Design a protein with these regions (language model features):
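Acidic/charged, solvent-exposed loop-and-adjacent secondary-structure segments enriched in E/D, K/R, S/T
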Residues: 161-186
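Acidic, serine/threonine-rich low-complexity disordered tracts
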Residues: 1-159, 199-285
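Beta-strand/loop-rich accessory regions of lumenal/periplasmic or secreted enzymes
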Residues: 186-197
Length: 285
C-alpha cells in the first residue's frame, strides 16, 4: 500500500470570539450532502465511511412527511464548538483507525467550519465551509476539500450559480443550498430550534454542493437512540440518507443536544461494504 502525505498542513481560519447559540425565525428554506469523503486519500480508496456504537431505538415511525424550505419555522444556530472523534473504517478488507477534528465557529453573522481527518502515515483530508448566517440558517459562500491540493466550490448568489475550481460545469444555485460540510450544521440548527418538530419518518431535502458538483440529498428522520461513544453515553437523533445512485454511500448521522445538536456520530457505508464510522470522543473548551 502506497503511503500518501499532504503537501502542507491545513490551517483553520480565524475563530470567532462569541460562543453563543443564535436564534432566527425562518420563513422559507431548503438544502443537503456529505462529510463522508473526508477519510479518502489516494492510498486508502474512495470515500470510506465514519463511526460505530451500540444504539437502541424506540417508538413506531409516524407517516412520512417532507419538511421543505418553507415548512421550517425557526433556526437555532449551534454555539461555537471544537469536537474530536475516533474513527474506524474498512477499505477493501483493510481496517484502519484515524482521528477526526471538527472546529465550528460563529459570531452571529458569519460562520467558519473545518473538519479534518488525519493519520500519521496516511496524511490528512480537510473540508472547510465559510459563509453567512441568515434567518434561514447557514448560507455558504465557499466550500473547500483538500487532500494534497485543494479543490473548491464558490456560491454566487447574485448569479444564482455555483462555480468549481476543478473546471467542472457550473451548477444552478437553489434556495437554501448547503455544502457537504455545512449541511450537518444546518441540520443541527433546524433540529436544535425544534427538537420535537420533526416526526419520525419526516424527510429533509437539500441541495448539497461538493467540490466538483451539486446533488440532491434527502435525509429521513429516525428515532432518538442511546449511543455508547468514546466520550460517554449520549442520546442522539438518528437521520440517514439512502444512496441515490449505484455507487453512492449510505450516510447516517446522529445529532445530540449535549453538543448543540452537532454530530456525535457519522457513519458512511459504501455499496461494497466499505465503511467509515466516526464517533465523538470529547468536546474541547
Amino acid at each position: 500500500m502506497e503511503r500518501s502525505t499532504p503537501d502542507s498542513t491545513p490551517v483553520l481560519g480565524d475563530v470567532f470570539k462569541e460562543n453563543t447559540a443564535v436564534a432566527h425565525i425562518n420563513n422559507d428554506f431548503s438544502a443537503t450532502e456529505n462529510i463522508a469523503n473526508l477519510v479518502t486519500t489516494e492510498s486508502v480508496a474512495s470515500e470510506p465511511p465514519v463511526l460505530l456504537a451500540d444504539a437502541g431505538s424506540a417508538s413506531s415511525p409516524a407517516p412520512a412527511k417532507s419538511v421543505s424550505a418553507k415548512a421550517v419555522r425557526s433556526i437555532l444556530v449551534p454555539p461555537s464548538a471544537h469536537l474530536k472523534y475516533d474513527i474506524k473504517g474498512e477499505v477493501k478488507g483493510f481496517p484502519y483507525q484515524v482521528r477526526g477534528d471538527l472546529r465550528w465557529a460563529q459570531d452571529g453573522k458569519t460562520y467558519d467550519a473545518r473538519m479534518e481527518i488525519s493519520h500519521f502515515l496516511l496524511g490528512s483530508r480537510v473540508q472547510t465551509s465559510t459563509g453567512q448566517l441568515t434567518g434561514h440558517g447557514l448560507e455558504p459562500t465557499r466550500f473547500g476539500d483538500k487532500v494534497r491540493s485543494e479543490v473548491a466550490a464558490h456560491f454566487d448568489y447574485e448569479k444564482n450559480k455555483v462555480t468549481f475550481s476543478a473546471n467542472t460545469p457550473d451548477a444552478p444555485l437553489l434556495s437554501g443550498a448547503q455544502d457537504q460540510l455545512s449541511v450537518f450544521m444546518q441540520l443541527a440548527a433546524m433540529i436544535g430550534a425544534e427538537p420535537r418538530g420533526f416526526p419520525e419518518g419526516s424527510t429533509l431535502p437539500f441541495q448539497a454542493v461538493g467540490p466538483r458538483s451539486a446533488e440532491s440529498w434527502v435525509f429521513t428522520v429516525g428515532a432518538t437512540e442511546k449511543l455508547q461513544m468514546p466520550g460517554g453515553d449520549v442520546s442522539a437523533l438518528r437521520l440517514w440518507r439512502d444512496p441515490s445512485g449505484e455507487y453512492d454511500p449510505k450516510v447516517e448521522v446522529w445529532l445530540a443536544a449535549e453538543v448543540g445538536f452537532l454530530p456525535v456520530r457519522i457513519r458512511l457505508t459504501q455499496p461494497n461494504g466499505d465503511f467509515v464510522d466516526q464517533q465523538w470522543r470529547e468536546t474541547q473548551k
